[in-house]
């Protein structure tokens, strides 16, 4: 199966799981179900298959263009979902994670941002450089999941304030647990991004200032959120809002890198 076909199947799995859950929610008879979790597993398996096929064709980690970066980001987010979901009610975190994975992959599939590897596309491996890039994108995956948890927090807080407790509310994690999850995910992403930046400086003799500026900018944003939370300068609600806003800015950096960095150097 061609790598893009694997990606299309993965994207359909995420859409199927999300659509099923939305249908059940709309019927007013929501109950925790393994269907969405199974769809997430299917999507992840085909995501992994795509990355393996593309990596084999390139003889390198598949992070050579914005198309591959978006898929790797989606994969990282889903992987982290499986790692932390058991602590924060798998079914509901997956409901909010699957549409974001679907959006990332749909944008990648329909946008003219891919250059499929040809028979001469294989390049000399650069393990440390690939490690630097992969760590940085996994950090973005942690920020994406923090954004998802932030949305869940804001939905639950609104329902509590308006006293309109709908079916989904009773299956959301306690709001205090969501606040802790957001903080820990941001902290995890911050540490990974720090490692990514440090390894980037270590493995590249020349400095690409466009990447440095964007990367350090994201690092400062999330570092500021963590520091403000540590000093009790912001409420948990504000941290949730900032996690959503910060990830929106982070997504813009991916496009910024695509336009500002030298072609093919992602």
Q: What does each model-identified segment do?
A:
Residues 30-42, 91-98, 182, 211-214, ...:
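Membrane-interfacial loop-to-transmembrane alpha-helix junctions, especially the N-terminal start
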Residues 138-163:
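Transmembrane alpha-helix/helix-exit interface in multi-pass inner-membrane proteins
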Residues 224, 228-249:
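Interfacial loop-to-transmembrane junctions
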Residues 252-266:
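Juxtamembrane boundary at the C-terminal end of a transmembrane helix
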């Amino acid at each position: 199966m061609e790598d893009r076909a694997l990606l299309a199947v993965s994207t359909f799995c995420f859409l199927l799981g999300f659509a099923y859950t939305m249908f059940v929610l709309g019927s007013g008879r929501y109950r925790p179900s393994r269907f969405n979790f199974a769809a997430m597993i299917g999507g992840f398996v085909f995501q992994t298959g795509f990355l393996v096929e593309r990596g084999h064709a390139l003889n390198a980690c598949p992070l050579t263009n914005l198309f591959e970066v978006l898929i790797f980001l989606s994969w990282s987010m889903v992987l982290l979902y499986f790692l932390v979901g058991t602590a924060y009610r798998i079914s509901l975190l997956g409901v909010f994670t699957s549409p974001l994975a679907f959006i990332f992959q749909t944008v990648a599939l329909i946008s003219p941002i891919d250059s499929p590897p040809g028979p001469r596309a294989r390049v000399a491996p650069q393990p440390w450089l690939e490690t630097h890039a992969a760590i940085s994108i996994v950090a973005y995956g942690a920020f994406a999941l923090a954004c998802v948890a932030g949305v869940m927090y804001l939905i639950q807080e609104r329902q509590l304030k308006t006293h309109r407790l709908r079916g989904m509310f009773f299956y959301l994690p306690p709001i205090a647990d969501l606040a802790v999850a957001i903080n820990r995910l941001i902290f995890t992403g911050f540490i990974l991004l720090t490692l990514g930046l440090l390894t980037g400086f270590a493995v590249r003799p020349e400095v690409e200032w466009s990447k440095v500026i964007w990367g350090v900018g994201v690092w400062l944003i999330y570092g500021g959120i963590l520091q403000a939370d540590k000093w009790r300068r912001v409420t948990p609600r504000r941290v949730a809002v900032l996690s959503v806003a910060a990830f929106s800015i982070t997504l813009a950096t991916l496009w910024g890198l695509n336009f500002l960095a030298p072609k093919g150097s992602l």
